[in-house]
Design a protein with these regions (language model features):
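Short, acidic Gly/Pro/Ser/Thr-rich loop/turn segments
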Residues: 60, 82, 131-133
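Glycine- and acidic-residue-biased ligand/ion/polar-headgroup-sensing regions
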Residues: 67-89, 128
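Ser/Thr- (and often Asn-) enriched beta-sheet segments in non-cytosolic proteins
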Residues: 29, 38, 84, 90-92
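Short beta-strand His + acidic residue motifs that chelate non-heme Fe in jelly-roll/DSBH
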Residues: 62-65, 81-85, 108-115
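N-terminal low-complexity or simple alpha-helical regulatory segments
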Residues: 1-68, 74
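Alpha-helical bundle regulatory/interaction domains
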Residues: 94-161
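Short, charged/polar low-complexity linear motifs in solvent-exposed/disordered segments
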Residues: 57, 68-70, 82, 100-102, ...
Length: 161
């Protein structure tokens, strides 16, 4: 079976994380005196990754990077997360909140805080250039336009809800 290209590392500060390959996925971890963060990322198929996150710290000072064609859906299962973006906007998520948005603008760069020092969440990352190739193989060219579907949530804006 062909290995599925990982795109999650293209938007993360890998120098801050330890990385290890496990069966069917990758674990990214950060251990500091202030706490821990762990992400278990699974490639679903080309251009789509599902990531489970668990954090037990107040803040992660990182510089998430934009990636043209990247769309994400986030779900906060437990705890709380706050992302302060370079454009001055702030995203707050509490338990059972969902957010969607494009991660392709330079203003996507952000830092992250966890006011309760605890967070569990899931995110679905869709890298449109690769995912569209896979969808085209399954259902035929031009049958489904992933960017158009994602824009129904964000209407070409950076953030949906």
């Amino acid at each position: 079976m062909n290995a599925v290209e990982k795109f999650k590392p293209k938007v993360m500060d890998l120098d801050m994380l330890s990385t290890r390959e496990v069966e069917h996925g990758t674990i990214y971890e950060m251990n500091t005196p202030q706490g821990k963060a762990k992400m278990h990322s699974y490639p679903v198929f080309g251009g789509v990754e599902l990531t489970f996150q668990e954090v037990t710290m107040k803040e992660i000072r990182h510089r998430a990077k934009p990636l043209e064609g990247m769309f994400e859906i986030h779900y906060c299962k437990e705890g709380r997360i706050e992302c302060a973006f370079d454009n001055g906007k702030v995203l707050y998520m509490d338990e059972n909140d969902i957010s969607v948005g494009w991660k392709e603008s330079p203003s996507y760069v952000h830092s992250t805080k966890f006011p309760t020092a605890f967070y569990k969440g899931i995110n679905l990352s869709i890298y449109i250039p690769k995912a569209q190739e896979m969808v085209n193989k399954f259902v035929g060219n031009d049958s489904i336009d992933l960017r158009e579907i994602c824009n129904r949530f964000c209407n070409d804006f950076e953030f949906g809800f």
